[in-house]
């Protein structure tokens, strides 16, 4: 058996086609949504991600604002840029590209963002609203992951879902999202303290691998026919690798490639959050 490809690039194109129409409708009312990025330092991967985000904006007609700062920027200088974006009406939403250099307090930076302009959905207030199931910008990677499963008909209602990884950007929030009534999944969150990971994954209908450990999920750990999302990214010998070993494709029923799976949707839902806020401000 060869797994169905959960094609994030295909679905991204569909989302962007919808967003282009929505942005055009906003422009007819004289409103142009704006996405800003704050990038600190010279990390090549971060620069690549930010470049792609601005290219996405250009494609669908969203204004983009770049704030590139040196690696030795102080906490106060970074706060000043964040305060500027908080007060800039042309900026509908923005992100601070993570990770930040070690001398900066990441949590304090995220807290400084205006929760209403939090395009990443990672502000403590918005994560708290997710716990309470109140409307707020949703974290982009979990939202993209769940939407990708839905797009290709993977059943979530009543499904046993195993999430590998307990990070703030994916593992923790995706568990909250999957246990909402709209998804209704039973979720097991696995991590370095899990005693028998293979036993957990072999019982799963859906596996979301977000550990950042290259090829750590192998075919013998997957139930035949299960759906697998390869979310984690790591670098080995200069190559980017996902968490899912290639042999999983011979056992699983559906697998997201990496790259080309969840990644394009993370970017799509970032722009989606900005467009959605612009519509809300416009009363649409």
From Swiss-Prot:
Please give the Gene Ontology molecular function terms for this protein: methenyltetrahydrofolate cyclohydrolase activity; methylenetetrahydrofolate dehydrogenase (NADP+) activity
Q: Which InterPro entries match?
A: Aminoacid_DH-like_N_sf, NAD(P)-bd_dom_sf, THF_DH/CycHdrlase, THF_DH/CycHdrlase_cat_dom, THF_DH/CycHdrlase_NAD-bd_dom
The record's Gene Ontology biological-process terms are: L-histidine biosynthetic process; methionine biosynthetic process; purine nucleotide biosynthetic process; tetrahydrofolate interconversion
Gene3D superfamilies recorded: Leucine Dehydrogenase, chain A, domain 1, NAD(P)-binding Rossmann-like Domain
- One GO location term (cellular component): cytosol
Q: Describe, as the record does, how this protein assembles with itself and its partners.
A: Homodimer.
The protein's name in its UniProt record: Bifunctional protein FolD
This protein's species is Corynebacterium glutamicum (strain ATCC 13032 / DSM 20300 / JCM 1318 / BCRC 11384 / CCUG 27702 / LMG 3730 / NBRC 12168 / NCIMB 10025 / NRRL B-2784 / 534)
* Gene (name only): folD
């Amino acid at each position: 058996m060869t797994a169905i490809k959960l094609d994030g690039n295909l679905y991204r194109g569909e989302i962007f086609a919808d967003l282009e129409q929505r942005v055009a409708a906003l422009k007819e009312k004289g409103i142009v949504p704006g996405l800003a990025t704050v990038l600190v330092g010279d990390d090549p991967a971060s620069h690549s991600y930010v470049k792609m985000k601005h290219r996405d904006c250009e494609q669908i007609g969203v204004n983009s604002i770049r704030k590139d700062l040196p690696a030795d920027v102080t906490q106060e200088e970074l706060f000043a840029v964040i305060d500027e974006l908080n007060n800039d009406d042309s900026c509908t939403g923005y992100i601070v590209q993570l990770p930040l250099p070690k001398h900066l307090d990441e949590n304090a930076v995220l807290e400084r963002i205006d929760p209403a302009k939090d395009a990443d959905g990672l502000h403590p207030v918005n994560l708290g609203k997710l716990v309470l199931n109140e409307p707020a910008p949703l974290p982009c990677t979990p939202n993209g992951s769940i939407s990708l499963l839905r797009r290709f008909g993977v059943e979530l209602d009543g499904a046993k879902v195993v999430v590998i990884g307990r990070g703030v950007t994916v593992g923790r929030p995706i568990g909250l999202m999957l246990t909402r009534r709209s998804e209704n999944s039973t979720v097991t969150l696995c991590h370095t303290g899990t005693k028998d990971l293979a036993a957990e994954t072999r019982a799963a209908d859906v596996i979301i691998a977000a550990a950042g450990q290259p090829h750590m999920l192998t075919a013998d750990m997957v139930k035949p026919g299960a759906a697998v999302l390869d979310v984690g990214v790591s670098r080995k010998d200069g190559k980017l690798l996902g968490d899912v070993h290639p042999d999983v494709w011979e056992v699983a029923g559906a697998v997201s490639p990496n790259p080309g799976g969840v990644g394009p949707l993370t970017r799509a839902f970032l722009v989606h959050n900005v467009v959605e806020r612009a519509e809300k401000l416009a009363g649409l």
